[in-house]
């Protein structure tokens, strides 16, 4: 049995669904929301690589590397902002973020 395009798309759909559920079911913790966004980006990358391999074109794989780079930078900056926010406020709850308005 070979692993075809449908298998990759099914795994990507499951990861995408888990990411969406993580965002909608847990709106109180910013770290969980950030991790859910990363799951969504991972699902998109799996789709890009799967279609790129299926079509025999390398552009999708190059774009997936670009998306991974941007996602890593986004996660690093987001976590750094959360650490500073936690040190100042003592909480990372979404309800407390509106206090940052200034």
From Swiss-Prot:
**One Pfam family recorded for the sequence:** Oxidored_q2
The superkingdom of the source organism is Bacteria
> Which InterPro entries does this entry report, sorted A to Z?
NADH_UbQ_OxRdtase_chain4L/K (IPR001133), NUOK/Mnh_C1-like (IPR039428)
Could you provide one GO biological process annotation from this protein's UniProt record?
ATP synthesis coupled electron transport
What Enzyme Commission number(s) apply to this enzyme?
Answer: 7.1.1.-
**Transport found in the keyword field:** yes
Q: Name one GO cellular component term.
A: plasma membrane
Query: Localized where?
Result: Cell inner membrane
Task: Write one Gene Ontology MF term.
Answer: NADH:ubiquinone reductase (non-electrogenic) activity
Identify the keywords attached in UniProt to this record, alphabetized. Cell inner membrane, Cell membrane, Membrane, NAD, Quinone, Translocase, Transmembrane, Transmembrane helix, Transport, Ubiquinone
The record lists the membrane-crossing segments as 5-25, 30-50, 62-82
Tell me what reaction this enzyme catalyses: a quinone + NADH + 5 H(+)(in) = a quinol + NAD(+) + 4 H(+)(out)
Stated membrane topology is:
Multi-pass membrane protein
Coarse class of the primary localization is membrane
Query: What is the purpose of this protein?
Result: NDH-1 shuttles electrons from NADH, via FMN and iron-sulfur (Fe-S) centers, to quinones in the respiratory chain. The immediate electron acceptor for the enzyme in this species is believed to be ubiquinone. Couples the redox reaction to proton translocation (for every two electrons transferred, four hydrogen ions are translocated across the cytoplasmic membrane), and thus conserves the redox energy in a proton gradient.
Q: Which family does it belong to?
A: Belongs to the complex I subunit 4L family.
Classification via NCBIfam families:
PRK05715.1-2, PRK05715.1-3, PRK05715.1-5
Oligomeric state and interaction partners are given as:
NDH-1 is composed of 14 different subunits. Subunits NuoA, H, J, K, L, M, N constitute the membrane sector of the complex.
Name it.
NADH-quinone oxidoreductase subunit K
